Amino acid sequence: HCLKYGLTLHNVLQVRGFTAQGEPISFGAEALDAPGYDLLSLAVGSEGMLAVTLEVLVKLVPKPQLARCIMASFDDVRKAGDAVAAVIAAGIIPAGLEMMDKPMTAAVEDFVHAGYDLSAQAILLCESDGTPEEVEEEIARMSEVLSRHGATAIAVSQSEAERLRFWSGRKNAFPASGRISPDYMCMDSTIPRKRLADILLAIAEMEKKYQLRCANVFHAGDGNLHPLILFDANDPDQLRRCELFGADILETSVAMGGTVTGEHGVGVEKLNSMCVQFSAAENAQMFAVKRAFDPQGLLNPGKVIPTLQRCAEYGKELVRGGKPKHPDLPRF
């Protein structure tokens, strides 16, 4: 529900901990603002690479009095994508705005029997929460926008049990995918909302290119994709094609104005993709920040920043039989 309530960054007021050298740090404050650079945002977004966190002060919000959910069917993914953009353009910020394509809908319906329209090419789940009066007005406005942009069917939850049933398919998308494929790789990228249909059509072409199926489920409201590439990890060639497929999705997302991650982070899986999104100079600047906080490279070494030389710089390069890896590449 970060579309309405914000990301982790927007809900953390203060972080306390220690650097790798044992120096105490404190970023942010209990007050709404703090002087100096916004190091709190830097710490929250660092994936544990800059400091060891011991204490986090978070913002709490009241639990809404009521929540209701719209389930809308579309006979075309472009119409569904356009409807997502239209909801936001109308000044409506739903508590949740999720989308599933036909393969994913079929998988979850067989698993949890949520009552999804199996003839639909895409399904949107749009949730409104707040006071009963606010919810009633917002549900009516969203229904009107969805109808105007091609929804073939619209159902509105009339009870808490029905709302949970609508959501049960979305929340069980990953385990449902495990029923239709031995393995799957979940990707995580973000694109502008207006390109939702474009990326889905591009992924459909990639399915043909790599000869692998893909089921799509994602946080449509903020353009955060979670394509699930279906494959068999016991087949080395399928694994190879799956990894290429995933990298292609990330590169295409960047080309469409998006990013290589939305919420899962970079870690080691997306190191190469960081070179697609950022220039060598930009990656070097991020590495400089890392060195300033952690000069010995003790915290999450080898993560996020794609620079080979750091392994040699820190004396952590693995050498077997006196032969370093990639001897042709420059080192310091």
Feature names for model-found ranges:
Residues 281-332:
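Intrinsic disorder at enzyme termini
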Residues 24-25, 94-96, 152-155, 260-262, ...:
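Acidic/polar loop patches that form or flank catalytic/metal-binding clefts of enzymes
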Residues 218, 259-266, 301-304:
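Short acidic/histidine-rich active-site segments
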Residues 234, 268-275:
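Short beta-alpha connecting loops at secondary-structure transitions
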